[in-house]
Amino acid sequence: CFVTSNSFANTPKSSGKYKNWESFTVMTDKGKVCFAQTKPVKRAPAAIKRKDSRIFVTFRPNENVKDEISITSGHAYKNSTVSAKSGKSNFSFFSQGDFAWLLDENEEKKFIKLMKRATDLMIKGKTKDGAETTDHYSMMGFTKAYNTAKKVCS
């Protein structure tokens, strides 16, 4: 499971900003953590109050974790899957609390490939009350932010 930035003892430091994506590094009690993250360019519906939405790709070398993809839509998810779509490619994430993850490393590798070639990504999830939320993300800058996070933690 991804450790949210709120639980870091130290403030994450930017390793580089690349268009819509940014890379960060932070020291935790388990060692260095590096991640690339982005915010959505569009969120709907506006009427639903929620915290920030984000996509993260995380590296935790001391825990042998790489390419861990996590999503938050800024609300606790209903006990259901969260979907990611770009073009004809669809992925399902399992949710727990206010985060969602892919099921295994194989899916993460496929998703990283998609993110490298995609221009945009749409994430759909349901709140605990069953309302659907949709976040639209730009993939512009992803590859550079991803490569920076990976290099800093290798």
Could you describe each region identified by the protein language model?
Residues 3-9:
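Sec/Tat signal peptide C-region and signal peptidase I cleavage site
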Residues 9-154:
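A generic "folded-domain core" signal
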